[in-house]
């Protein structure tokens, strides 16, 4: 607030020998050095059209673009002092063609904010004002599966643990008639030795992985989106479903065991090549993969949706039976 800024200015003027407040950059530098202002906040204020740094009860303190992608920032709850992640858009952002073609849904975000679970990320609130739209979620500690796999494949035991957590998360969404629609190694985080968490997109409605207007808040390389696209997406008008979520889980499981995308020539496939691959080519698995695990994965990635597990609950039971499979 302006009153807070005036108080800080008076404090700084006193502590620095009454430096003139007319020296705006000196004052800003001192505010950064004393922890009152972040470099990100200063840069935001200096933009031709400044982005808001206070949204409802939240203060925007830093960018998370390197970690999470465009429009992600770190926020602090002013009243509780807790740190949160925030995805935010200005009016200009939402005028981009991809958002106009596939706009955010505040109603969807409110639905997601009411759903919680130990293996799901927690979305706290959505703020929609004339000049901006923002969603706030808890901060996750750890690293995405994609980064973890850059160091090598998971063990069978770790992959089963990952699947238990992620299937629990997906079952919680499906039970509330919500489709994830963006399951890739970017949406699964290892938060501790014993826990994986599923990130979700609470505000952009799920869409085909091949969509030209793809703008999920979970920043995902095109190759990973296409690698997890169920065969039925080759049909025009196909929408994400429970079955396409299960297919994506199977691909991610195989990816985790191999340490790479489990389809041949994946780095050379165009969109048509990916569609033919999902329709015709068997998924790749390591030779050392135990047969009970391989059987689960093959059920998940069956070309015909009716040949897959019926739902996430049936998959959870199959995974529970894998104790000792490693």
For the regions a language model picked out, list residue spans one by one.
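Non-catalytic accessory regions
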Residues: 1-112, 123, 129, 135-137, ...
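Conserved HxN/HPN-centered segment at the entrance to the catalytic loop
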Residues: 116-124
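Conserved protein kinase catalytic/activation segment
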Residues: 187-203
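Conserved activation segment of eukaryotic-like protein kinases, specifically the C-terminal portion
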Residues: 216-232
